Amino acid sequence: MIDNSHLTEHGIKYLTMISKQFVLITSNLKHPAFRVKADNMHIIYQDKLNLRNALTQLKCQYGCERITIQTGGTLNAMFLREKLLDYVDVVIAPVLIGGKETSTLIDGESLTTMDDLKKLGVLQLESCETLKHSYIRLRYKVIR
């Protein structure tokens, strides 16, 4: 899990209770996880978040071969722009939400040049599935 400020000490304890192994990646030296003692908790501290390095550590130190990312637009953008995604799985809800301050699927800095566009992966639709209550699931392969 990547977190700097959202998890509480209670939340960390809960996650360690329900997890076989729990790995936290943070750049916050005052993160509440540092106060929790749990044999199955591991903390990867980075001065500044480096996703590629964090993924390498997860693989080399903990044997992690595959991860699922369920995050907000800022981290989504970081993973996409660093070309760290193989697949994108999106579930669309039957509601329209918006506004100037509303987070989107991909947040972060605006793309303003052709070089910025090259940082993105092109998506190839692999499947489209209608779910209950008018939800739609789209699965894409990221083409590099």
Predicted regions and their residues:
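Enzymes that bind and transform nitrogen-containing heteroaromatic metabolites
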Residues: 1-144
